[in-house]
């Protein structure tokens, strides 16, 4: 699901604020094959087409990304223009599905800006911090302990955890060096 914003003139934009690393850094015009520059040499677009899992007459909007014009497009997710209500979200609560990627991994992303332009991003997936600038990704740091990761959240993302928040990961699947022993991302 994404938010679809309709302007007074009828123009629609898809706004996805939660996808993560290869997500769009700005609203995308809801127009098939409209290419938007994202970060560095990375392009993103939406296409309105069928997917192999559906019948041929059912079209979905697909979010695609490529890291440079000469590379192929990668499809990441798809969505419809179906409207969802509060009651729909209640039954789709994360508490009903505790095994999805976002509840079993520690994730953070920060877009790097100079004035108004996004030129890169820094990402944390479990115990690994990666930096992506100019379409190239490199590992910045690998954490061995939960204490190191907590310090890294502050250093790389400006996130300071309270003592209660630090205690909250103990014994969980994503805990580093503990019972949960998270897996590298």
Regions found by a protein language model. Name each.
Residues 106, 115-185:
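Extended, charged low-complexity segments
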């Amino acid at each position: 699901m994404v938010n679809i914003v309709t302007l007074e003139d009828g123009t629609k934009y898809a706004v996805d604020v939660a996808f993560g690393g290869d997500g769009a850094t700005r609203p995308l015009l809801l127009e098939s094959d409209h290419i938007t520059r994202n970060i560095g040499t990375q392009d993103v677009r939406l296409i309105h087409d069928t997917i192999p899992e559906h019948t041929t007459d059912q079209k979905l909007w697909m979010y695609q990304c490529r890291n440079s014009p000469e590379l192929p497009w990668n499809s990441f997710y798809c969505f419809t223009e179906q409207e969802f209500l509060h009651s729909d979200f209640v039954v789709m609560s994360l508490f009903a599905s505790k095994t999805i990627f976002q509840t079993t991994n520690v994730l953070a992303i920060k877009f790097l800006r100079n004035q108004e332009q996004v030129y890169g991003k820094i990402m944390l997936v479990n115990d690994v911090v990666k930096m992506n600038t100019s379409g190239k990704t490199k590992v910045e740091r690998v954490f061995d302990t939960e204490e190191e990761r907590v310090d890294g959240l502050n250093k790389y993302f400006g996130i300071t955890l309270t003592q209660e928040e630090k205690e909250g990961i103990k014994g969980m699947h994503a805990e580093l060096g503990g019972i949960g022993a998270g897996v590298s991302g």
